[in-house]
Amino acid sequence: MEKLEKRYGLPTAICMVVGTVIGSGVFFKAQNVLAATGGDMPLGILAWIITGVLMILCSLQFASMAQKYQKVSGVVDYAEVTCGKGYAYYLAWFLVNIYYPGMTSVLAWVSARYFGVLFGWDLAGPEVLCLAGFTLVASYTLNAFSPKLAGKFQISATVIKLIPIVLMAIVGTVAGLKSGVLTSNFTTVVSEAVGGKSGGLFAAVVATVFAYEGWIVATSINAELKNPKTNLPIALIIGSIIVVVAYVFYYIGVAGGATNAVLIEEGATTAFTNIFGTIGGTFLNICIVISCLGTLNGLMVGATRGMYAISSRGEGPRPEMFNQVDKSTNMVTNSSIWGLFVCSAWLLYFYGANLTSGWFGYFNFDSSELPIVTIYGLYIPIFIIWMIKEKELGFVKRFLLPVLALAACGFMVFAAIYAHGITPYLNAKANGEFSCPVLFYLIIFAVIMLVGAFVKKPKKK
């Protein structure tokens, strides 16, 4: 089997974590958090911090595992050394055919959507859909033809996307304190949160889960990272902390640009326009486009390397084909082609399920969030077996970190089930109807995993 070149350093790995997480979520989820808490600023900040802490807890556990294990694809390797080759295969199959392409396809559409805002396009129209397809192919092309250039773009996109966040955090806070808007937003609420403060907090945390998702994608470059045992743990921890700090201060800065009532109705663009003028509003949309493209690039890195991770273990369909590395670009070309195909299929599904009247009936679900139901659930056996097997480790690494990570995973899974299962079911039941997106997502998940079981081992000659 051909080996991948060690080409990425610590800055790229940190940018992969920051760039993959800080995407569309930080800009439009702030509005959702305000709505969930009824405009209660301190409660909203607490929600951002809670979810951020959960992400850091999982990062710490994976950082601990990265210090001991490394092979090809990060989290898949951790699954193999803890739960065995069989479990690692199914985790990799899930990542390749559901998680990476589902998230990547949505980010392609979101990138096109915010670009379309600049020209007044219909957000569900053919222009945005065509542009989404183009951005998907463009990201694939960048990663397939020049992985090093893709890494440099990741660094550039991370720096650019932090500019509006930093500006809003500083200028928005100062302007808000000067005008009194920020003080007013902190001391008053627009309305009582549904279910009281506890219900509002839980709903807000659910809203922030998507904004924090994606950090684990950085582990997909484990085999291409220089000194991975040291650099990957550092990248996961530093990157996660940067994300939490950026989200909290951006959220505060936005509140300095408009009242909570206005922000709930119109979103963060109004705050940028109030502080920086019309040009500032346009600048925000441009930065959002760059932010989403950076996130798309980070997810495409994982999507294009997925089948390589499976075939490198001699499993899956045609392993001898998918583990080939192009000699001129040092890229896993055949694996990349499969990644693009599956991403395109999920883009078609996302459009039909979420941007039209619904092509799939009960099987319409949000492919941007529901993979969380399984990705965190699939981490749980890894952490449990780690505690059982790693007897030579001290108390902190063997028990404390994995237990905290298990609690974080359990919360994430329950939050996703609550938001996409319990709530829509109760709302539909009140109207004499039935709706449970998470149930039908899990059916699709089961079918895809059964296909994976069918092609698990190559046929013997």
Regions inferred by a protein language model and the residue ranges of each:
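TM-loop-TM module centered on a large, flexible mid-protein loop between adjacent transmembrane helices
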Residues: 75-80, 84, 117-121, 235-298, ...
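Hydrophobic transmembrane alpha-helices that form the core helical bundles
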Residues: 32, 56-136, 140-144, 289-306, ...
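Juxtamembrane helix-boundary/capping and inter-helix hinge elements in multi-pass membrane proteins
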Residues: 35-40, 68-72, 81-87, 223-231, ...
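Transmembrane helix-loop boundary segments of multi-pass membrane transporters
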Residues: 34-39, 114-128, 148-157, 266, ...
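A generic transmembrane alpha-helix motif of multi-pass inner-membrane proteins
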Residues: 176-177, 365-384, 388, 395-461
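Membrane-interface "cap" regions at the ends of multi-pass membrane proteins
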Residues: 1-42, 55-60, 71-72, 456-461
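Helix-loop-helix junctions that connect adjacent transmembrane segments
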Residues: 3-6, 45, 122-127, 155-285, ...
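Membrane-interface loop-to-helix entry segments
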Residues: 127-181, 213, 236-240, 374-380, ...
